[in-house]
Amino acid sequence: AALPELDPQALAPITEAVARSVELLGDTPLIGFAGAPFTVASYLVEGRPSRDHAITKALMHEHPDVWDALLAWVARTTGAFLRAQGLAGASALQLFDSWAGTLSVEDYLAHVQPHSAAVLAQVADLGMPRIHFGTRTRHLLVAMREAGADVMGVDAQTPLDEAVALLGGRTPVQGNIDPALLDGPWAELDAHIRDVLRRGATATGHVVNLGHGVPPTTDPDVLTRIVELVHSVPDLLPDLPPGSLPHPDGAP
């Protein structure tokens, strides 16, 4: 049976939540968020998180017509979901492809990229930055950008300056503080953040963010300290060596 199309009225709680958040945030931008077609489809097919997405890939290769129909449906639904957030006041929109890193470049280009591109095309006329992110997607960065992204999110496994170079030095990046360090010693996290900032200075633009989601055990005060640290660091030069960023209190 055909999957039902999304009823626009179902998005009313989303648009209300975004509008209220934007009002409360004032000048602080809000990034809209949606799961990309491959990642959403993998949950539909597997029914749970998967290490290798073998069942998903089997459907992709053994029944390509079914696969394309499924991803086209997800793309329409996701595009409407993302567009609603943009119209409600989000400042940028992010397409989050958590599990795309399990794909080869060939499979991504043939079976996934067209559907991610369809999502990003649905919000192109809104005139706001479109961010595309995936984990373990170093080998897919260029292909993911070519789906229609203005900014590329980079995971914690890929050094930010390497990602910038792979993207030809012309694409702003987002990332990539390692979430695994948020529960560790502050000194280690502090040094890591400074290194991320140094590497990000090689890009044409850098949205400082995590390299994946916030772990549920994270102390919110740590996130506050991260924001304060990032705002305290002066503009960086691309040739600053690791460990050379000054501490805000003047300590070495």
Protein language model regions, located:
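Alpha/beta catalytic barrel-like cores
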Residues: 1-10
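Active-site loop segments of alpha/beta catalytic cores
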Residues: 10-252
